[in-house]
């Protein structure tokens, strides 16, 4: 069954194995997640749990948010996500989820919002090749041809300059290297999307190797 938890990306470090090999890991502080709601087929048409992470200031929460959180005997949350494919019998409204739901060696998917890069050209945004940088060349870092004249328009999906980053990104099949239950930290192998202190969702890997 699927399981997941929300956390905050703290940054990267390295962990040394028994044979002295260094493994780059990302440290995720999962804190205390609270089950805000259980959804079932009869009421909602599908099965899922809704979890909340990180308390929101009371003056920033509206009345529906306060009422929704009160049913779980908790404060309104900044980040709320749904996780499908879970066994509803294992969860209760108001239950706290911590780092110990994962174990070392498990494979997980980590989803987050990628770093925003602003308005970027085709070379940085789409990994296009540049033209010759010689004096005689009249093409260096432009987007290149946008298609034939005949359609009288530019087709959708053309690789052009524009806003880069700030997208929902999921990195699949990352190994859990270490779980620190005292400090509620999960260390996963490799990098995960987003800047430091951003919210990420750690869930059971969908495509297990």
From Swiss-Prot:
Pfam families: Ribosomal_L3 (PF00297). GO terms for cellular component: cytosolic large ribosomal subunit. GO terms for molecular function: rRNA binding; structural constituent of ribosome. One of its GO terms (biological process) is translation. SUPFAM superfamilies: Translation proteins. Keywords: Ribonucleoprotein, Ribosomal protein, RNA-binding, rRNA-binding. NCBIfam families: L3_bact. One of the primary rRNA binding proteins, it binds directly near the 3'-end of the 23S rRNA, where it nucleates assembly of the 50S subunit. HAMAP family: Ribosomal_uL3_B. Part of the 50S ribosomal subunit. Forms a cluster with proteins L14 and L19. Belongs to the universal ribosomal protein uL3 family. This is Large ribosomal subunit protein uL3. It comes from Brevibacillus brevis (strain 47 / JCM 6285 / NBRC 100599).
